[in-house]
């Protein structure tokens, strides 16, 4: 059984790239183009990992992360922020909002999966390795 | 005269007095009638006239009835022998007696009127009055009345002038001879007699008798022999004795005439006139002389009395005292005065100023004393003399010595040295002048006012100048007059509450021209001309007040300006802040917007090269790698530019982390390992064990080390890159050592400038933005550390960073 990854990203190219990369790396990918959809999708499919863009329409990544962390059913899912917000303090802001990891764009396909999985909790990493 | 009258009244009973007057008058009249001209009552010497005048003078006007009665009886007696009918004799006697009485009354009245001495014969003035009024004028009245009435009743007008003249002369002689004896006898002091005096008297009487006999009964021409005899009497005996002697001589003279007359009837009248003149002149001469002598004697006596009375007191006084008589001859002096003249006090009597002083000085003293005697008033003077260059002051007091009549008979002079007092006074005066000067010329306006009435007592010149009032105007004013209405009441209250030295506060004063000035005053109580007063110093603070107001205004203005400026700055600051925020937002947006397309470029090329979508031929791979490389270069360029911009805009915020440098270096090695491996270079780390954790910005420290390591790898073709970490001087030192090209010494300084890559020739060979070292240097500075380089061409370079263990940026 594949791990489920939810990607919340408004940029179609990025969405396509991450989806392609994750699928190629044996992930089941769910897509959401805004925050509300993302939270709905997370509620419905209960992903193993959430890749979260920060700059999003209507509801930004920080808000989504906080919302997710406030949900009892979802607060254990690792959230990895993938963002072009590479300014000083952005990382800290992201982590403070509840994210588990931070990968700045542009991503490097050579080590992206490795970096993402380095933020996984032990139990999830074991499951991933068993696959 | 009061005294004499009361003495009389005591001695004699009034009634006895009257009887005595009548008897004596009548008896002397009987005697006189013996010598009377035939058929008349006119006698060559009419003694009763003297008795009448003396009685009125001594006992007063009230005794006149006795005189009248006696005169009437005497006349009656005298006329009864005439051929006139009795009633005529009666009337004639009454009229003649009236003349006799009037004679005494008028004579005595006139003498008393002009002489204030009870005994007129004691002074020259009184004696003159006695002779003129009593002996010459008054008898004329009696003679006129008597002669005229006699001729009317008898009708013997042919003897009128002869009668008148004899009557007048007879009365005159009677008065001149008898009145002085009675008057002088009244005051005569018998106790002054002693044996010596009595012996002299006996001798004198013998001489007198012998002389009289010689003259009147033998050699008539020797009449001048009387002169020494009478002078003896005058000088050696008193007035009374002399009067008696005059009477004796007169009696002898008349008796001799009568004796001669019997022998030579033809010459009788003529001889009587001659002897009358002789007696009259002798009497007058000796009356005058004796009065003068008496006056002198009495004056001498008074002086002597006044001297002896205070003698001991005067002797002991420190003052110098002398007494001069009215002729300015010294009479006496005390020892101090004698010492001044270098003589004994006993030697002074009889001397004058001429005996002691140079003539001009003596002349001067004489003039002063004469003027003093003439004024008769007490004189106090201060005399200044200069002797041997020294100034001496003498206080001189001259007191007139007066006799019982108030006439000045001498000078009592008292003088003493007051030089010291004068010097003290002068000193005082100078002092006073000094302080007066201090007050009057004081540049501060000063005023003195009465504490009770608040009236001005004095003000100084500065005050007059300041306020414009004249001195007279000020002295008519009160303190509140200077103040505006609204301050007057408060001022009076304050003025009454001040004590001692006090600050009187801030007030307004109105000057004469109406202008108002602001003042402050300080005052002090003082005693001014024996009244409670207060001196106040006034300071005009009008200008200061104006300046204060101006300053206040300026201060306000400044405050406003500051407020305005602050507001402006606030706005500017807000603007700047918003510009900063704008810049931050711009940088963030740029960063974000540039990364998004790069994400696709780098991401997709990466994925294509992984051949995830499908297999690629070699040419495709080669081209995709080139694309990937360009994308990565572009990304690092963007990162560097953003970093530099942030640093220069002050937008780079540093975080404070506690970390181990070994971890950071391991991360760098891990990250750079693929690059080193690709160039076949050895990348190693050598970290001193037990390095302490440091406090700094971990991300930035790592960024700098990555930069240095990547640079080293970039410029090294063969060999190795080594990273060392060690502790040195409480600083963490990280060295990145390569075996690369090395850097020329003159290039080293340029290294850390932006967009510099050493040797533009190889620049193109080594890709990079040229910003790395510049950013690294700036970051190190921000972190409180430093970066430096050591290099040797062709051998390699060593980049060294030093970081404080505990950062406090």
Features from the language model and the residues they span:
Chain A
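Charged docking surfaces used in two-component/phosphorelay signaling
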Residues: 16-24
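Active-site residues of response regulator receiver
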Residues: 53, 83
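Hydrophobic residue at a beta-alpha junction
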Residues: 32-33, 56-59, 68, 89
């Amino acid at each position: 059984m594949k791990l489920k990854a939810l990607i919340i990203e408004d940029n179609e190219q990025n969405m396509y790239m991450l989806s392609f990369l994750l699928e190629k790396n044996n992930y089941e990918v769910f897509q959401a183009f805004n925050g509300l959809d993302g939270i709905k999708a997370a509620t419905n499919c209960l992903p193993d990992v959430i890749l979260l863009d920060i700059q999003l329409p209507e509801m930004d990544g920080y808000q989504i992360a906080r919302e997710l962390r406030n949900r009892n059913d979802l607060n254990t899912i690792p959230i990895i922020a993938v963002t072009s917000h590479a300014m000083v303090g952005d990382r800290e802001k992201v982590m403070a909002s509840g994210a588990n990891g931070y990968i700045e764009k542009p991503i490097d396909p050579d080590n992206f999966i490795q970096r993402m999985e380095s933020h996984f909790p032990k139990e999830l990493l074991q499951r991933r390795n068993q696959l | 005269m009061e005294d004499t009258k009361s003495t009389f009244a005591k001695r004699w009973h009034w009634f006895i007095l009257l009887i005595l007057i009548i008897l004596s008058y009548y008896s002397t009249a009987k005697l006189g009638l013996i010598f009377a001209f035939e058929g008349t009552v006119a006698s060559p010497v009419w003694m009763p006239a003297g008795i009448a005048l003396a009685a009125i003078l001594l006992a007063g006007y009230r005794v006149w009835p006795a005189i009248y009665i006696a005169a009437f009886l005497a006349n009656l007696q005298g006329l009864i022998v005439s051929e006139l009918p009795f009633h005529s004799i009666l009337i004639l006697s009454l009229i003649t007696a009236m003349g006799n009485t009037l004679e005494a009354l008028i004579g005595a009245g006139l003498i008393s009127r002009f002489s204030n001495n009870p005994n007129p014969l004691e002074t020259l003035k009184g004696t003159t009055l006695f002779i003129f009024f009593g002996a010459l004028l008054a008898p004329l009245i009696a003679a006129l009345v008597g002669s005229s009435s006699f001729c009317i009743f008898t009708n013997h007008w042919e003897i009128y002038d002869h009668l008148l003249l004899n009557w007048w002369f007879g009365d005159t002689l009677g008065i001149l001879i008898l009145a002085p004896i009675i008057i002088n006898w009244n005051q005569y002091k018998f106790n002054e007699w002693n044996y010596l005096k009595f012996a002299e008297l006996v001798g004198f009487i013998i001489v007198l008798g012998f002389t009289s006999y010689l003259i009147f009964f033998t050699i008539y021409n020797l009449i001048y022999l009387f002169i020494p005899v009478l002078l003896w009497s005058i000088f050696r005996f008193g007035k009374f004795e002399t009067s008696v002697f005059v009477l004796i001589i007169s009696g002898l003279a008349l008796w001799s005439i009568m004796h001669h007359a019997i022998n030579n009837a033809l010459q009788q009248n003529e001889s009587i006139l001659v002897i009358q003149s002789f007696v009259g002149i002798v009497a007058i001469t000796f009356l005058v002389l004796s009065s003068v002598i008496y006056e002198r004697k009495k004056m001498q006596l008074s002086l002597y009395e006044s001297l002896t009375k205070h003698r001991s007191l005067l002797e002991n006084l420190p003052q110098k005292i002398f007494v001069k008589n009215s002729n300015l001859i010294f009479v006496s002096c005390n020892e101090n005065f004698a010492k001044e003249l270098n003589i004994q006090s006993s030697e002074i009597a009889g001397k004058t100023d001429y005996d002691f002083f140079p003539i001009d000085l003596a002349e001067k003293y004489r003039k002063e004393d004469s003027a003093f005697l003439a004024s008769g008033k007490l004189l106090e003077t201060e005399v200044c003399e200069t002797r041997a260059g020294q100034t001496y002051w003498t206080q001189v007091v001259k007191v007139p010595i007066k006799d019982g009549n108030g006439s000045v008979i001498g000078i009592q002079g008292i003088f003493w040295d007051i030089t010291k007092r004068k010097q003290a006074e002068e000193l005082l005066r100078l002092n006073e002048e000094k302080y007066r000067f201090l007050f009057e010329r004081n540049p501060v306006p000063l005023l003195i006012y009465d504490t009770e009435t608040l009236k001005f007592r004095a003000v100084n010149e500065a005050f007059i100048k300041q306020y414009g009032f004249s001195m007279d105007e000020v002295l008519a004013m009160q303190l509140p007059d200077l103040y505006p209405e609204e301050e007057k009441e408060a001022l009076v209250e304050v003025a009454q509450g001040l004590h001692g030295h006090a600050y009187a506060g801030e007030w307004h004063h109105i000057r004469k021209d109406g202008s108002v000035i602001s003042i402050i005053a300080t005052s002090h109580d003082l005693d001014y001309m024996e009244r409670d007063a207060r001196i106040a110093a006034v300071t005009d603070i009008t200008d200061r007040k104006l300046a204060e107001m101006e300053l206040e205004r300026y201060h306000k203005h400044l405050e406003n300006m500051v407020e305005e400026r602050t507001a402006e700055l606030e706005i500017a600051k807000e603007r700047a802040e918003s510009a900063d925020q704008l810049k931050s937002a711009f940088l963030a947006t740029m960063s974000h917007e540039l990364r998004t397309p790069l994400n696709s470029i780098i991401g997709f090329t990466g994925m294509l090269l992984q051949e995830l979508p499908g297999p690629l031929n070699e040419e495709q791979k080669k081209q995709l790698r080139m694309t990937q490389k360009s994308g990565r270069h572009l990304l690092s360029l963007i990162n560097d530019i953003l970093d530099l911009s942030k640093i220069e805009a002050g937008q780079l915020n540093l975080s404070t982390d506690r970390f181990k440098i070994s971890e950071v270096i391991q991360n760098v090695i891990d990250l750079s390992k693929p690059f080193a491996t690709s160039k076949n270079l050895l990348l190693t780390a050598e970290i001193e064990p037990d390095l302490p954790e440091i406090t700094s910005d971990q991300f930035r420290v790592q960024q700098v080390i990555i930069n240095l390591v990547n640079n080293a790898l970039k410029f090294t073709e063969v060999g190795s890159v080594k990273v060392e970490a060690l502790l040195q001087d409480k600083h963490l030192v990280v060295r990145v050592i390569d075996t690369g090209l090395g850097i020329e010494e003159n290039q080293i300084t340029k290294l850390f400038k932006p967009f510099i890559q050493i040797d533009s020739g190889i620049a193109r060979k080594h890709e990079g933005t040229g910003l790395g070292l510049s950013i690294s240097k700036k970051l190190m500075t921000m972190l409180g550390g430093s970066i430096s380089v050591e290099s040797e061409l062709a051998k390699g370079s060593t980049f060294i960073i030093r970081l404080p263990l505990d950062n406090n940026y």
